[in-house]
Amino acid sequence: MAQGLAIAATCSCIVAGCLFVADGQAQAQTATQTPPAQVTPAPAASTQAAPLSPMQEKALKPKDTFKECANCPEMMVVPAGSFTMGSPTSEPGHSADEGPQHTVTIARQFAVGRFEVTFDEWDACAADGGCNGYKPSDEGWGRGRRPVINVSWDDAKAYVAWLSKKTGKSYRLLSAAEYEYATRAGTQTAYPWGNAVGTNNANCHACGSQWDARQTAPVGSFAANGFGLYDMVGNVEEWMEDCYHDSYSGAPADGSAWIEGADCSSRIVRAGSWFFAPAFLRSAKRYWFTTDYRLNYLGFRVARTLAP
């Protein structure tokens, strides 16, 4: 990857490099930063560690959690519902590809990773013969419960393929609509917690956390959102299933991934990261990378389709 490539007139310099944005794409040059002095432990994981039976799956209700193997991601059940996707033109930081706003209806509950996929979870995949045996660099920040980084969209797809095979269940990446619905958790504000970035709500370039513009934080280091999900914005960017379109004209209204009518060599990323300015953490913000990009602020979380 060509780092620090100036592909646009819009540039926001962020400590270790400059973040460039054009036509929905973000590129950046980064460097290892001085580590913070303190680490906040993540919440304890669920004790469930076996594939759900059909009866157990049908009994699930919103905010229930489950794990389908010892090293599988902990999943949180998200309710069905409708929301307004995108942002109004009046929202600070709004870009044209966040419109037009439109109603999306998620007809069935589904499960979302309670946390971003961690190094522990990724390394278990590689050790089990999955993930193409790839061991991404942790930049010297540590592995364990930190989110996996330096993974491409292709890498993320290899992980969900392994997870699906291991559990016999339908794991996948989130659609962009599912992501925004789960991030907003019933809100229509710029951020999941309000219209201002505030202090210590997330890990970004200027979020007031001990990790800001330095490195990733252990997953679960900040308060959960209204659906009980952690780090839905900030910490690491997250790969989506969708291809990139420059507006929502013609977007699906059912929450499914939008893969028609676009160059799918590039896929949507959401959430912002430890390296990005606060505006990139807005619930509606969207941009894209080519599927082979591996960056030290880029990771993912998983979703799972549930039985009706």
What residues fall within each predicted segment?
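Residues embedded in well-ordered beta-strands
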Residues: M76, A111, A190, E238, ...
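Functional-site microenvironments in short loops/helix caps that host divalent-cation chemistry
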Residues: T84, P88-H94, S137-R145, V151-K285, ...
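Sec-dependent N-terminal signal peptides
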Residues: M1-Q25
